[in-house]
Amino acid sequence: MNVLGIETTCDETAAAIVTAAEDGRAVIRANEVLSQIAEHAAYGGVVPEIAARAHVEVVDRLIARALQEAGLGFDDLDGIAVAAGPGLIGGVLVGLVTAKTLSLVTRKPLLAVNHLEAHALTARMTDGIAFPYLLLLASGGHTQLVAVKGVGEYVRLGTTIDDAIGEAFDKAAKLLGLAYPGGPEVERAAEGGDPERFALPRPMLGRREPNFSLSGLKTALRIEAERIAPLSGQDVADLCASFQAAVVDVVVDRVRVALRAFGDVAGHPTALVAAGGVAANAALRRALSQLAGEAGLPLVAPPLPLCGDNGAMIAWAGLERLRLGLVDDITAPARPRWPFAEPLATAG
């Protein structure tokens, strides 16, 4: 089975072809990603109108390139998957209209995929892990701890009550005068810094519910930066290292709490999975790997090119749904907001 995946929910335009082999393994035949970082860098963040226009300009070309790289034509496809949300509505519409048009013309099934669900299922594409598993989904706009019980079966154990982890990194970078996107810049600066120089708080540490709160940490960082201004290069490095260490400590503590809660929801997990753009952070990966080892679990984190938004994860999520007969009507809506995990309090 071959599925085309289209991703346009934020500032990456992506198209990919993923094949499900007879033994169930995933083969990524093509994975084209075009980032818009250069277009948004001057604004310090993503400008929705600019993002949507950029998607319009390149999405058709990326689809053609993906098909060419895979050595396939539209007749060889078994389905067309697209991220129908959540995300910036203009970008989501670009991808969805493109996918619907292709579905109508080629008469291939439309698979309207939840972008967050695609992140959640990426580990099955890369490592073939079985359900159930504990997912840490950490990106620029989302931070959740989820019990992944099956395709379409997700129970949210915890979430952020204010800033997402990626959002906090971006705001920290902007505060310290670093470039956009902030996550990689903070991580790079932290490599030369002293993580113990500044005693930044660890919000929510020790709380029974595995929720996150990072706004207080961001405020503490600003206070320290203002206290020692003007900042030298070493000051910035030390602030970044201290900030990153605090975030990692908070995440590890919250994941530990979620692991304890997992058994009551879904039994014994097969793995701890980290997904989303923040999962590319090396310090976080090391800490999560140690935690997983202590719990007797493997840490499964996608290869770095598959941590951020990409078309392969959309294609794979489409394949997972297609194999269960979960196809969508041509009237499937664009959903700028689209929760994918049921809160624990309402889970059956």
Swiss-Prot record:
Residues annotated for Fe cation binding in this entry: 115, 119, 309
Keyword tags: Acyltransferase, Cytoplasm, Iron, Metal-binding, Transferase, tRNA processing
MF terms (GO), sorted A to Z: iron ion binding; N(6)-L-threonylcarbamoyladenine synthase activity
Catalytic activity entry: L-threonylcarbamoyladenylate + adenosine(37) in tRNA = N(6)-L-threonylcarbamoyladenosine(37) in tRNA + AMP + H(+)
Textual note on the cofactor: Binds 1 Fe(2+) ion per subunit.
UniProt binding sites for substrate: 137-141, 170, 183, 281
Predominant location category: cytoplasm
One Gene Ontology cellular component: cytoplasm
Function, as annotated: Required for the formation of a threonylcarbamoyl group on adenosine at position 37 (t(6)A37) in tRNAs that read codons beginning with adenine. Is involved in the transfer of the threonylcarbamoyl moiety of threonylcarbamoyl-AMP (TC-AMP) to the N6 group of A37, together with TsaE and TsaB. TsaD likely plays a direct catalytic role in this reaction.
Localization annotation: Cytoplasm
Family according to the record: Belongs to the KAE1 / TsaD family.
Matching InterPro entries: ATPase_NBD, Gcp-like_dom, KAE1/TsaD, TsaD
Protein name per the record: tRNA N6-adenosine threonylcarbamoyltransferase
GO BP term (any one): tRNA threonylcarbamoyladenosine modification
Cofactor requirements of the protein: Fe(2+)
Pfam families: TsaD
Highest taxon listed in the record's lineage: Bacteria
EC number: 2.3.1.234
Organism: Methylobacterium sp. (strain 4-46)
